[in-house]
């Protein structure tokens, strides 16, 4: 296995660390998958503990950040750096430790973006807050912010990076399909 393959595998493994689940046990909440939406991410943890949700958000973001930083230390190939982010997000969504049932990847995507282009995190956050203030849906805020950043990547990066980021974005959106259906039916929980 060459160094590039090793970094992609390591990015997947880093991404697959289920911090929301680990912190929910440490914090005495039990199995977060049996609470609220059943998701292991920060939004679901938020339903039981704001403090643990913040820590979950930070640690899930760090998974993407560390994976991208690792790739950047071994290669100046920007496409490879984006691929490392993709593998970290896939790890978060489909962790080997949890029978491939993980989170939605928003925080890990955000951490990846933070290392690649920190200004995009500011835009993401602004879009997220605006949509959240208007609609009160975390899921809708995440989807619209992800699409917005996808458009920014398309205008600032090459075709290879843009396609890789498109795949990341589509994965995040697909992970939100149930939320989209609930929003349409008027059954999505507001925060």
From Swiss-Prot:
Pathway: Lipid metabolism; phospholipid metabolism. GO terms for molecular function: acyl-phosphate glycerol-3-phosphate acyltransferase activity. Disulfide bonds: none annotated. Keywords: Cell inner membrane, Cell membrane, Lipid biosynthesis, Lipid metabolism, Membrane, Phospholipid biosynthesis, Phospholipid metabolism, Transferase, Transmembrane, Transmembrane helix. One of its GO terms (biological process) is phospholipid biosynthetic process. It is found in: Cell inner membrane. It comes from the Bacteria. One of its GO terms (cellular component) is plasma membrane. It is an enzyme of class 2 (transferase). InterPro entries: G3P_acylTferase_PlsY. Its EC number is 2.3.1.275. It is a multi-pass membrane protein. The chain crosses the membrane at residues 7-27, 51-71, 80-100, 115-135, 139-159, 161-181. It catalyses: an acyl phosphate + sn-glycerol 3-phosphate = a 1-acyl-sn-glycero-3-phosphate + phosphate. Catalyzes the transfer of an acyl group from acyl-phosphate (acyl-PO(4)) to glycerol-3-phosphate (G3P) to form lysophosphatidic acid (LPA). This enzyme utilizes acyl-phosphate as fatty acyl donor, but not acyl-CoA or acyl-ACP. Belongs to the PlsY family. Probably interacts with PlsX. This is Glycerol-3-phosphate acyltransferase. It comes from Ehrlichia canis (strain Jake). The gene is plsY.
């Amino acid at each position: 296995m060459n160094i590039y393959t090793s970094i992609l595998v390591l990015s997947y493994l880093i991404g697959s660390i289920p911090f929301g689940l680990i912190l929910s046990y440490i914090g005495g909440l039990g199995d977060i998958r049996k609470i609220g939406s059943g998701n292991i991410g920060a939004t679901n943890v938020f339903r039981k503990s704001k403090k643990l949700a913040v820590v979950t958000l930070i640690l899930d973001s760090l998974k993407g950040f560390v994976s991208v930083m690792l790739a950047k230390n071994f290669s100046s190939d920007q496409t490879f750096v984006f691929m490392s982010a993709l593998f970290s997000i896939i790890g978060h969504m489909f962790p080997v430790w949890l029978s491939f049932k993980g989170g939605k990847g928003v925080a890990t995507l955000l951490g990846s973006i933070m290392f690649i282009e920190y200004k995009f995190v500011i835009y993401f956050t602004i879009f997220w807050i605006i949509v959240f203030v208007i609609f009160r849906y975390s899921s809708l805020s995440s989807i619209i912010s992800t699409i917005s950043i996808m458009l920014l990547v398309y205008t600032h990066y090459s075709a290879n990076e843009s396609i890789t980021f498109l795949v990341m974005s589509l994965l995040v959106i697909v992970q939100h399909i149930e939320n989209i259906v609930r929003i349409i039916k008027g059954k999505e929980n507001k925060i």
